[in-house]
Amino acid sequence: MQTVRSYFFGPTPQEQNRKWQSIIRKEQRQLDRQVYHLKAGRKKAEVQLKQLAKQSDITNMRILAKEIARANRHGKRLAESKALLGSLSLQLNDQMAMLKIQGTMQSSTKIMQDVSSLIRLPQLSETMRNLSMELTKAGVLEEMRDEMFLPVEDDEELMDLADEDEEVQEILTKYNVIPAPSEKAADAATHREQSLKQALPSLSNGIAKDSTEIDEEQLLDIRDKLDALKS
């Protein structure tokens, strides 16, 4: 009976909300899987990092530490995306509660903010575009302007070299790979920047060819897996 009614009159607000919640839960599970695989790849990279330390292979240690730093930043973005999805889910349920009281759903600024943030994320863009159109038809969301669909800028491109060097240094220090740099060195920041430019060549040219325990193929495999998780 419910299906027949939906065919002639369209889905009820409650049916619409169940569909929206299902979409949100699906995306949250996708993010959970990405986080799981990202952690597994990062753990493997950390093991390889310690093995490189035993070989005193500073160049490749820095390359791998840079990949771990990127994985950490990507993991943070995934966590923030899941939190936004959770916020959107709560806001939509609040709309259903308001519907019972006032008999209608109203456009929400908070929902607009959450959808705007989520739609700019590459991994959620297509799903959130489709969801935003449904929310607009239901009157929960005002029509979004074109600039709201622009993708978020990649922090990998915006990151300053010195900041990236600092992250790499923190990772190496965390795993007791090399000692933290001396704060008394007046030219420490400049030296680190110059060192990193030399220590982080492309993987195709920068992997040590004479490594006995970890060869070029292993390091390329690690980086490929980390890059795949970020796509």
UniProtKB/Swiss-Prot annotation:
Cellular localisation: Endosome membrane; Endomembrane system
GO cellular component: ESCRT III complex; mitotic spindle pole body attachment site; multivesicular body
Domain of life of the native organism: Eukaryota
UniProt topology in membrane: Peripheral membrane protein
Chain spans, region Disordered: 184-214
Pfam families in the record: Snf7
Protein's job: Class E VPS protein implicated in concentration and sorting of cargo proteins of the multivesicular body (MVB) for incorporation into intralumenal vesicles. The lumenal sequestrated membrane proteins will be targeted into the vacuole after fusion of the endosome with the vacuole.
Family named by the database record: Belongs to the SNF7 family.
Assembly and binders: Component of the endosomal sorting required for transport complex III (ESCRT-III).
Protein name: Vacuolar protein sorting-associated protein 24
Species: Schizosaccharomyces pombe (strain 972 / ATCC 24843) (Fission yeast)
